[in-house]
Curated annotation (Swiss-Prot):
Assigned GO CC terms: cytoplasm; ribonuclease H2 complex
Localization terms from the record: Cytoplasm
Domain of life: Bacteria
Catalytic EC class: hydrolase
Gene name of the record: rnhB
Cofactors named for this entry: Mn(2+); Mg(2+)
MF-aspect GO terms: manganese ion binding; RNA binding; RNA-DNA hybrid ribonuclease activity
Alphabetized PROSITE patterns for the sequence: RNASE_H_2 (PS51975)
Protein's name in the database: Ribonuclease HII
Cofactor remark: Manganese or magnesium. Binds 1 divalent metal ion per monomer in the absence of substrate. May bind a second metal ion after substrate binding.
Keyword tags: Cytoplasm, Endonuclease, Hydrolase, Manganese, Metal-binding, Nuclease
InterPro entries: RNase_HII (IPR022898), RNase_HII/HIII (IPR001352), RNase_HII/HIII_dom (IPR024567), RNaseH-like_sf (IPR012337), RNaseH_sf (IPR036397)
Reactions catalysed: Endonucleolytic cleavage to 5'-phosphomonoester
Protein EC: 3.1.26.4
Amino acid sequence: MTAVRAPRRRASSDEQGGFDFSRPDEIVCGVDEAGRGPLAGPVVAAAVILDPAQPIDGLDDSKALSAKKRDALYELIVARSLSYCVASASVDEIDTLNILHATMLAMKRAVEGLSVLPTLAQIDGNRCPTLTVRAEAIVSGDALVPSISAASILAKVTRDRMLVDLHERFPVYGFNVHAGYGTAKHLAALREHGPCEAHRRSFAPVRAALDLIR
């Protein structure tokens, strides 16, 4: 499993103590995922520590933003965050562990890949992965906490790009349009062509398509 991260550098103790996230004694990373629901492709997670000296306007839940806005914010987050890491869990890991545990694994990888050690990880949703740092779950955190919003954008944009790449390999499914979600056209393609190696065989519609071609 590979992770995409900011160039590694360790913040000095003075720099780490200078954050102001309304939690002056904390170094907070926001964590979110993309791709729990689709029938194909990996689940992707991102962890982001924002730099208060370089604020980013317009951060929000990635699902509330247009693709153009997400792409623009992605570049700003990569350029301005103090540290970020994007990681994933593969289709094989999803099928072996189940989607919940694979998502927790991707989140853990993202946090552990940060070049600056956080003291607190704020996780979107109602569950936290097992981490070596303190963690708290925040329901709707991707719309409420800027660093989680940033993580949601990195995860979403990264995964969408992965699915565009998968479309080049498996064009009959339309991954570039629906990102692996179970749209009517995707389900029709599954029934006609059967699943490819990128499909999650632990998901019921994929299993049903397999049964049709046996």
